Amino acid sequence: MRLLLIFSFLTSLVCAETGYNGKSILLTLPSPSGILSTHDLNISVLAHPTDKNRGIAILPIDYYASTGDSNITWIAPGKSISILLIIKMVSYPLETLSVDPAKVTPPPEALERIERERSQAKAIYEHFTPIRYWDRAFIKPLDSNITSEYGSARTYNGTLQSYHGGVDLRARTPIPVHATNEGIVILAEDRYFSGGTIIIDHGEGLYSCYFHLSRYEVKVGDYVHQGDTIALSGDTGRITGPHLHFGFMVHGVQTDPLDLIEKINTLFIPQKEDFVSAITH
């Protein structure tokens, strides 16, 4: 859900918001400054893309977050807002998949590569680029149907391995994959589980991910625009068939990509609130 906080005259405001594991909360704040603090994250408030007098903060809720209440505090010079965050669980589905056994129980010679790739990805996602490259709404990288939703618990060859950290989009034959928005290509290489992989840094803690690609149309360091063709879809890595896996990382936390871009895109819809309020959309 998107929480819009309009603040005037008061120096403190208390409200509540409900969030869900694996989803993000988008906060629109009364000033483009300050810090949003949770029990495990300190998030810089960012400039609103269409209103210079407001700020935004994107709070990802970890897939494995526990249910219950926690406090979020926004602090800026002379102002503060306390938000009671109520975390609820999403009932994600279970998927049973059959894949190459080597992608479930990797051979010993692959383990070093897998660990190296995980460490590299962690370092990428935890890096905060203090620049925003995008100034418009985000788009899906393919105009096709979803074949596997975000968050499903996945059993590979009878063994529960993980949850699905993105969405799968239908791509029966190699077709062009488009950048969801502007940014810098940070990674473009083959990886053990995700196959042909591209990661784009959109700035300010946002990274989009594209997996199982068959061909790259960009290289590391390239600046891409929304809609640019960055690759062709494929069937590389741990897959059951050809498709595109699309994911998003926010401040180092994996989040539902379509939920995230839907919420960010509301920032480009004019708002007309002109009173002191806390409104939940």
Roles of regions detected by a PLM:
Residues T180-E217, P242-L244:
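Zn2+-dependent peptidoglycan hydrolase active-site motif and core
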Residues L84-S194:
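Surface-exposed, glycine-biased beta-strand/turn segments
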Residues M1-F7:
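Sec-dependent signal peptide recognition
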Residues C15-P93:
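Cationic-aromatic interfacial patches
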Residues R191, I230-R238:
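Short, charged beta-turn/beta-strand-edge "cap" motif at the junction between a beta-strand
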Residues Y92-Q120, W134, K219-Q226, G247-H281:
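Acidic, glycine-rich catalytic/binding loops that coordinate metals and/or anionic ligands
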Residues T11-L13:
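N-terminal signal peptide c-region/cleavage motif recognized by signal peptidases
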Residues P176-I186, V218-S233:
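Short, well-structured beta-strand-loop connectors
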